[in-house]
Amino acid sequence: MPQVLNYASSGVRGTAAAALYARDRQGPKFAFQHLIYPMIDDRTAVRKDLHPCVGEFVWTQKNNYFGWRSLLGEEPGAADVSPYAAAARAADVSGLPPTYISVGGLDLFLEENLAYADRLSRAGVPVELHMYPRAYHGFYRATNARVTRQAEHDTREALRRFLHG
């Protein structure tokens, strides 16, 4: 049975780290990773040039700074942050499993997710990115919202395509 990595938000740090660690240590070959509005770059917590419309709902830059500071035990944005803590810090993203990323257009993590998807694609990793306009961080929790139902449908279809061709 194919092994699939799936997690949302800050939990993605562990998911993306597991994919990197497995690749680096010749661990299990994951068939697919599904990253839901992933929190993968500590540098977002200290950026001053963020788009003014992102990060205003649910997960703010202040929350993000606290989260990264708590995880790292030091200032986010330092030069020596491990890619196993912040996957966007990986120098090499080749050899990672096919990846599906879903993120809202108002999510604080939008820009880091777009950049990570671009890096994966340039490294030859099959990647599918869905950006849901006007959706904020955590929108999957609004289970009856049309955008959430669409995102869940898109996820199921991507999983089917990645696993069954």
Question: How would you describe each model-predicted region?
Answer:
Residues 1-165:
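Alpha/beta-hydrolase superfamily serine-hydrolase fold, recognizing
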